[in-house]
C-alpha cells in the first residue's frame, strides 16, 4: 500500500495539474470539444497497461525501455517505502493471480456468451426497429393514399358543383326562352289587335265618307258630272287621234 505521507505530498501537485488541464481543455470561445466514445477499447498489455505508454517509450528508449522503467519505478517505490507491502498486499496479489487465471480461462467463454446475448438483444432491437419502420412506412403510404382520396373527393365535389351550375343554367335559359315566347306571343296578339282595329276604323271611315259624299250629291250634279266626264273623254280621244 502507498504510505499516507507520500499520498499527501503528491495530492497538491495533482490538484494543481488537474486544474491547469481543465482550464487548458476549455476553448477560447467557451465551447468545449466533446470526446467521441470509441466503438472498441484500446489495446493493452499485461491486462491493464495501455499500448500508448509503450509506444511513447519506444521512440526514446527502444523496446526494453517501458519494462526497464516499470521495474525501476517499482524498485524505487518499494525501496523508499512509498509502497509498503503489508498483509493486504499479499492478499491482493493472491486475488490478482486468481483474477488473471479466471480471466484467461473463463474470459473467452464468458465473452462469447455475453457477445451472443448482446447479439440477441441487438437483433431483437433491430427487428423491433425494422417492424416499427415498416409500420410507420405503411402508415405514411396509407396517409398519402387517404390524402389522394381526399383530393379526389374534392375534385368530385367540384365536378358536382359544375354539373349543378350547368343544370341551373339550362333551367334558367329554358325559363327565359319560355318568358320570351310568352311575351312575344302576347305582343303579337296586341299588334294584331291594333291592326284589326285600324282596318276596321279605316273601313268604317271610308264607308262613312262614301255614304255622306253620295248622300250630298244631287241628281242634277250627278248628271252634270257625267256629261263633263263624257266631254273630257271625247276631247282626250280626239287629241290622241290627232297625235
Swiss-Prot record:
Alphabetized InterPro entries for the sequence: ATP_synth_Bsub_B/MI25, ATP_synth_F0_suB
Domain of life: Eukaryota
Single Gene Ontology MF annotation: proton transmembrane transporter activity
Keyword Transit peptide: yes
The entry's keywords: CF(0), Hydrogen ion transport, Ion transport, Membrane, Mitochondrion, Mitochondrion inner membrane, Transit peptide, Transport
Tagged with keyword Cytoplasm: no
PANTHER family given in the database record: ATP SYNTHASE F(0) COMPLEX SUBUNIT B1, MITOCHONDRIAL (PTHR12733:SF3), MITOCHONDRIAL ATP SYNTHASE B CHAIN (PTHR12733)
Function noted in UniProt: Mitochondrial membrane ATP synthase (F(1)F(0) ATP synthase or Complex V) produces ATP from ADP in the presence of a proton gradient across the membrane which is generated by electron transport complexes of the respiratory chain. F-type ATPases consist of two structural domains, F(1) - containing the extramembraneous catalytic core, and F(0) - containing the membrane proton channel, linked together by a central stalk and a peripheral stalk. During catalysis, ATP synthesis in the catalytic domain of F(1) is coupled via a rotary mechanism of the central stalk subunits to proton translocation.
Protein name per Swiss-Prot or TrEMBL: ATP synthase subunit b, mitochondrial
